[in-house]
Amino acid sequence: MSSALANIYARLPVSFTHGRGVWLWDTGERRYLDALAGIGVSCLGHGHPGLVAAISEQAARLIHTSNIYEVPQQAALARRLAELSGMSEVLFSNSGSEANEAAIKLARYYGYKQGNTHAHIITMDSSWHGRTLATLAATGSDKARQGFGPMPSGFIQVPYNDLPAIRAAGEAEPRVTAVLLEVLQGEGGIRPSDMAFLRGVRQLCTERGWLLMIDEVQSGIGRTGKWFAHQWADIRPDVMTLAKGLAGGVPIGAMLAAGPAAGVFAPGSHGTTFGGGPLACAAGLAVIDAIEQEGLLANAHEVGAHLHAALASELAGVPGIIEVRGRGLMLGIELDRPCGILATRAMEAGLLINVTRERVVRLLPPLILSGEEADQIVRILVPLIKQFLAQQQ
């Protein structure tokens, strides 16, 4: 790769030229089963005809005008997202970090309007919300923050899935205005929240007048088998953030607001040059259409359950395996030791995965994954894991 590139990525030694469905081909025409989907972004896989057509047609007509003007594609996508989520309004951006940054700003402005000039937000340990300074401060990872201090203040981190800890944090700090959490922690090791915990947090936020802000950047847009992972708990947040799969690979982010969070921002309180442009929103509309027309929510749920069960069965009783967990097509396999080398070994075997939290194999395949392709993942990955663990004894 070019020496002119900033040295911030530990890249695997492969370059891809094209893709089709769940498959990618490298410069040597070798084929790989993509079980990572660009870290959960390529939800329709590669070369999806509907998405390609929508992007091509929109690019030929108009790519960018800015938010100085009306953007019909933006308005249409906002309506679709509001219908699917039950939320009231949508603010578009370009990434998950930007969407979460907007949510943090909204929570602070919400507090400010109530006379709270130093609003605090409760966040979870092992969480991940982005790489801007505010989202890093919200993220539950000291390693990610190292060297970038001083961090913005106003964040209180508590253990995940611990409702009493959230309640205690609110009692200790009267300036709390919001709780920010992931329903299913992605970078945190595919850690699911308890449904009772989510319902309890919803009730607590309502009682205290706090905003419940849910980060669905990785778990949203059908990945768990529902449009948004919090829908499994039958709750609605006040703020929700989206990105990754929303436009199938075209950069986009979104912050949705409802209830007390709706109408907090006014003209001039936030903004973006590129966010919600015609191209990205046309892609987002195509993604939603494809998920609906091709039954991909049901597919993610059913094929994900099949893959989960197959992995759990094949790895049951294997020394060194802690747990197979997740929901839909957002799955993790936790080992009892660092296993980053498995990403390289899987790539060498024709399978694309990654490892998070040093010892959790993460699977985020496209929502179009078939049962047969799920079985191929199992056939490649399970022997690699068993071999790795046997060598480490």
Curated annotation (Swiss-Prot):
One of its GO terms (biological process) is L-arginine biosynthetic process. It comes from Bordetella bronchiseptica (strain ATCC BAA-588 / NCTC 13252 / RB50) (Alcaligenes bronchisepticus). Keywords: Amino-acid biosynthesis, Aminotransferase, Arginine biosynthesis, Cytoplasm, Pyridoxal phosphate, Transferase. NCBIfam families: argD, PRK01278.1. The gene is argD1. GO terms for molecular function: identical protein binding; N2-acetyl-L-ornithine:2-oxoglutarate 5-aminotransferase activity; pyridoxal phosphate binding. GO terms for cellular component: cytoplasm. This is Acetylornithine aminotransferase 1. N(2)-acetyl-L-ornithine binds at R131, T272.
